[in-house]
Amino acid sequence: GDVYKRQVLTDVLSLGLPAATEWLDPITPQYICDAISWGAIGARNTESQVHRELASGLSMPVGFKNSTDGSIKAAADSCFAAGFEHHFLSINLDGRVISAETKGNPDCHLVLRGSSHGPNYDAESVRQALEDLKVSKASGPSQHGLVIDAAHGNCGKDENREAEVIEEIAERLAHGEQGITGVMMESFLVGGHQKPAPLDQLVYGQSVTDSCVPWERTNELLHTLADAVTARRSAK
Protein backbone atom coordinates (compact mmCIF):
# COMPACT_ATOMS: atom_id res chain seq x y z
CA GLY A 1 0.00 0.00 0.00
CA ASP A 2 2.74 2.48 0.88
CA VAL A 3 4.52 1.77 -2.42
CA TYR A 4 1.38 2.50 -4.46
CA LYS A 5 0.61 5.51 -2.29
CA ARG A 6 4.01 7.03 -2.97
CA GLN A 7 3.73 6.29 -6.69
CA VAL A 8 0.38 8.09 -6.89
CA LEU A 9 1.84 11.11 -5.09
CA THR A 10 4.87 11.13 -7.39
CA ASP A 11 2.61 11.07 -10.44
CA VAL A 12 0.53 13.94 -9.05
CA LEU A 13 3.62 16.02 -8.27
CA SER A 14 4.97 15.42 -11.78
CA LEU A 15 1.92 17.34 -13.04
CA GLY A 16 2.94 20.33 -10.94
CA LEU A 17 0.00 19.78 -8.60
CA PRO A 18 0.60 19.89 -4.81
CA ALA A 19 -0.94 17.14 -2.68
CA ALA A 20 -2.62 17.14 0.73
CA THR A 21 -3.62 14.38 3.12
CA GLU A 22 -5.05 13.65 6.55
CA TRP A 23 -2.43 12.28 8.94
CA LEU A 24 -3.72 9.29 10.90
CA ASP A 25 -0.67 7.78 12.61
CA PRO A 26 2.96 8.69 13.44
CA ILE A 27 4.56 5.92 11.35
CA THR A 28 3.47 6.25 7.70
CA PRO A 29 4.32 9.98 7.36
CA GLN A 30 7.98 9.01 7.05
CA TYR A 31 7.19 7.30 3.74
CA ILE A 32 5.37 10.19 2.08
CA CYS A 33 5.84 13.45 4.03
CA ASP A 34 8.30 14.82 1.46
CA ALA A 35 5.53 14.60 -1.16
CA ILE A 36 2.82 16.37 0.88
CA SER A 37 2.29 20.15 0.88
CA TRP A 38 -0.52 20.40 3.46
CA GLY A 39 -1.80 18.07 6.14
CA ALA A 40 -4.89 17.78 8.31
CA ILE A 41 -5.59 16.29 11.71
CA GLY A 42 -9.17 15.03 11.82
CA ALA A 43 -11.84 16.03 14.32
CA ARG A 44 -11.56 12.76 16.24
CA ASN A 45 -7.77 13.08 16.58
CA THR A 46 -7.54 16.79 17.35
CA GLU A 47 -7.26 16.12 21.11
CA SER A 48 -4.69 13.34 20.64
CA GLN A 49 -1.30 14.10 22.19
CA VAL A 50 0.41 11.81 19.66
CA HIS A 51 -1.04 13.82 16.77
CA ARG A 52 0.03 17.09 18.37
CA GLU A 53 3.56 15.71 18.63
CA LEU A 54 3.40 14.45 15.05
CA ALA A 55 2.24 17.84 13.74
CA SER A 56 5.12 19.54 15.54
CA GLY A 57 7.56 17.59 13.36
CA LEU A 58 5.87 17.85 9.96
CA SER A 59 7.55 20.20 7.47
CA MET A 60 4.31 21.66 6.14
CA PRO A 61 1.28 23.65 7.35
CA VAL A 62 -1.07 21.45 9.37
CA GLY A 63 -4.75 22.15 10.00
CA PHE A 64 -6.47 20.87 13.14
CA LYS A 65 -10.22 20.40 12.70
CA ASN A 66 -12.71 21.53 15.32
CA SER A 67 -14.11 18.74 17.51
CA THR A 68 -17.19 16.82 16.42
CA ASP A 69 -19.21 18.75 19.02
CA GLY A 70 -18.21 22.03 17.34
CA SER A 71 -15.73 23.24 19.95
CA ILE A 72 -12.57 24.89 18.63
CA LYS A 73 -10.76 24.91 21.99
CA ALA A 74 -9.08 21.53 21.49
CA ALA A 75 -7.95 22.52 18.00
CA ALA A 76 -6.62 25.86 19.28
CA ASP A 77 -4.76 24.10 22.09
CA SER A 78 -3.33 21.61 19.59
CA CYS A 79 -2.09 24.39 17.32
CA PHE A 80 -0.39 26.00 20.30
CA ALA A 81 1.15 22.74 21.56
CA ALA A 82 2.40 21.70 18.11
CA GLY A 83 4.43 24.90 17.92
CA PHE A 84 6.87 23.56 20.51
CA GLU A 85 9.58 20.88 20.46
CA HIS A 86 8.43 17.33 21.17
CA HIS A 87 9.51 13.69 21.07
CA PHE A 88 7.41 10.80 19.79
CA LEU A 89 7.88 7.17 18.79
CA SER A 90 8.30 6.74 15.03
CA ILE A 91 10.67 5.21 12.47
CA ASN A 92 13.69 6.51 10.58
CA LEU A 93 14.38 6.32 6.84
CA ASP A 94 15.70 2.77 7.28
CA GLY A 95 12.50 1.63 8.97
CA ARG A 96 14.04 1.37 12.44
CA VAL A 97 12.08 2.42 15.52
CA ILE A 98 13.31 5.72 16.91
CA SER A 99 12.35 8.50 19.27
CA ALA A 100 11.75 11.36 16.83
CA GLU A 101 12.79 14.82 18.03
CA THR A 102 10.87 17.75 16.54
CA LYS A 103 11.51 21.48 16.30
CA GLY A 104 7.89 22.65 16.48
CA ASN A 105 5.57 23.69 13.67
CA PRO A 106 4.78 27.43 13.45
CA ASP A 107 2.25 26.93 10.63
CA CYS A 108 -0.59 25.09 12.37
CA HIS A 109 -4.09 26.51 11.98
CA LEU A 110 -7.78 25.84 12.51
CA VAL A 111 -10.14 23.99 10.15
CA LEU A 112 -13.88 24.58 10.56
CA ARG A 113 -15.71 21.38 9.55
CA GLY A 114 -19.12 21.83 11.13
CA SER A 115 -20.37 19.58 13.91
CA SER A 116 -23.18 17.38 15.14
CA HIS A 117 -25.01 20.62 15.97
CA GLY A 118 -24.82 22.04 12.44
CA PRO A 119 -22.55 24.07 10.13
CA ASN A 120 -19.98 26.67 11.17
CA TYR A 121 -18.81 28.06 7.82
CA ASP A 122 -20.94 31.23 7.99
CA ALA A 123 -19.31 34.64 8.34
CA GLU A 124 -20.22 35.03 12.02
CA SER A 125 -18.79 31.61 12.91
CA VAL A 126 -15.56 32.47 11.08
CA ARG A 127 -15.32 35.84 12.82
CA GLN A 128 -15.99 34.30 16.23
CA ALA A 129 -13.48 31.50 15.67
CA LEU A 130 -10.73 33.94 14.73
CA GLU A 131 -11.58 36.09 17.74
CA ASP A 132 -11.46 33.06 20.04
CA LEU A 133 -8.05 32.13 18.63
CA LYS A 134 -6.72 35.62 19.30
CA VAL A 135 -7.73 35.58 22.96
CA SER A 136 -6.51 32.00 23.49
CA LYS A 137 -2.92 30.83 23.73
CA ALA A 138 -2.91 30.17 19.98
CA SER A 139 -2.04 33.69 18.86
CA GLY A 140 0.02 32.36 15.94
CA PRO A 141 -2.79 30.34 14.31
CA SER A 142 -5.09 33.36 14.38
CA GLN A 143 -2.62 35.19 12.15
CA HIS A 144 -2.72 32.36 9.60
CA GLY A 145 -6.49 32.61 9.18
CA LEU A 146 -8.45 29.38 8.89
CA VAL A 147 -9.58 26.74 6.42
CA ILE A 148 -13.22 25.78 5.86
CA ASP A 149 -14.09 22.14 5.22
CA ALA A 150 -17.22 22.35 3.07
CA ALA A 151 -18.00 18.67 3.67
CA HIS A 152 -18.92 16.78 6.85
CA GLY A 153 -20.96 18.85 9.31
CA ASN A 154 -20.99 21.88 7.02
CA CYS A 155 -23.09 20.13 4.39
CA GLY A 156 -24.69 17.22 6.22
CA LYS A 157 -22.68 14.90 3.93
CA ASP A 158 -24.86 15.96 0.98
CA GLU A 159 -22.72 16.59 -2.12
CA ASN A 160 -25.27 18.98 -3.61
CA ARG A 161 -25.31 21.04 -0.44
CA GLU A 162 -21.50 20.89 -0.35
CA ALA A 163 -21.34 22.56 -3.77
CA GLU A 164 -23.72 25.27 -2.53
CA VAL A 165 -21.47 25.86 0.49
CA ILE A 166 -18.48 26.36 -1.83
CA GLU A 167 -20.46 28.86 -3.90
CA GLU A 168 -21.47 30.78 -0.76
CA ILE A 169 -17.87 30.94 0.42
CA ALA A 170 -16.71 32.10 -3.02
CA GLU A 171 -19.26 34.90 -2.98
CA ARG A 172 -18.02 36.07 0.41
CA LEU A 173 -14.41 35.97 -0.75
CA ALA A 174 -15.29 38.00 -3.84
CA HIS A 175 -16.83 40.63 -1.56
CA GLY A 176 -13.59 40.91 0.39
CA GLU A 177 -14.10 38.72 3.46
CA GLN A 178 -10.75 38.13 5.16
CA GLY A 179 -9.62 35.32 7.44
CA ILE A 180 -10.45 32.41 5.12
CA THR A 181 -7.18 31.08 3.70
CA GLY A 182 -8.36 27.78 2.25
CA VAL A 183 -11.30 25.54 1.41
CA MET A 184 -11.62 21.76 1.54
CA MET A 185 -14.00 19.80 -0.68
CA GLU A 186 -14.75 16.08 -1.03
CA SER A 187 -14.63 15.36 -4.75
CA PHE A 188 -14.35 12.29 -6.98
CA LEU A 189 -14.80 11.35 -10.63
CA VAL A 190 -18.43 10.25 -10.12
CA GLY A 191 -20.77 12.10 -7.77
CA GLY A 192 -22.50 10.63 -4.72
CA HIS A 193 -21.37 7.41 -3.06
CA GLN A 194 -21.91 3.65 -3.14
CA LYS A 195 -21.87 0.85 -0.61
CA PRO A 196 -18.69 -1.27 -0.40
CA ALA A 197 -18.89 -4.36 -2.61
CA PRO A 198 -16.62 -6.72 -4.58
CA LEU A 199 -14.48 -4.79 -7.09
CA ASP A 200 -16.34 -6.10 -10.13
CA GLN A 201 -19.57 -4.65 -8.71
CA LEU A 202 -18.26 -1.17 -7.93
CA VAL A 203 -18.69 1.94 -10.06
CA TYR A 204 -15.21 3.14 -11.01
CA GLY A 205 -14.39 6.54 -9.56
CA GLN A 206 -17.26 6.71 -7.05
CA SER A 207 -16.73 7.02 -3.30
CA VAL A 208 -17.42 4.10 -0.95
CA THR A 209 -17.47 6.45 2.07
CA ASP A 210 -18.90 9.99 2.12
CA SER A 211 -20.74 11.42 -0.87
CA CYS A 212 -18.52 13.44 -3.20
CA VAL A 213 -19.00 16.26 -5.67
CA PRO A 214 -18.60 14.95 -9.27
CA TRP A 215 -15.55 16.01 -11.24
CA GLU A 216 -17.37 18.23 -13.75
CA ARG A 217 -18.95 20.21 -10.91
CA THR A 218 -15.63 20.31 -9.08
CA ASN A 219 -14.01 21.91 -12.11
CA GLU A 220 -16.68 24.62 -12.16
CA LEU A 221 -16.32 25.28 -8.43
CA LEU A 222 -12.53 25.55 -8.62
CA HIS A 223 -12.85 28.21 -11.32
CA THR A 224 -15.46 30.01 -9.22
CA LEU A 225 -13.11 30.02 -6.23
CA ALA A 226 -10.20 31.21 -8.36
CA ASP A 227 -12.26 34.12 -9.68
CA ALA A 228 -13.32 34.97 -6.12
CA VAL A 229 -9.74 35.02 -4.86
CA THR A 230 -8.72 37.25 -7.76
CA ALA A 231 -11.55 39.64 -6.91
CA ARG A 232 -10.54 39.74 -3.24
CA ARG A 233 -6.93 40.49 -4.11
CA SER A 234 -7.98 43.25 -6.49
CA ALA A 235 -10.09 44.86 -3.77
CA LYS A 236 -7.14 45.30 -1.41
What does each model-identified segment do?
Residues 3-4:
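Short, small-residue-biased leader/transition segments that mark boundaries at the very start
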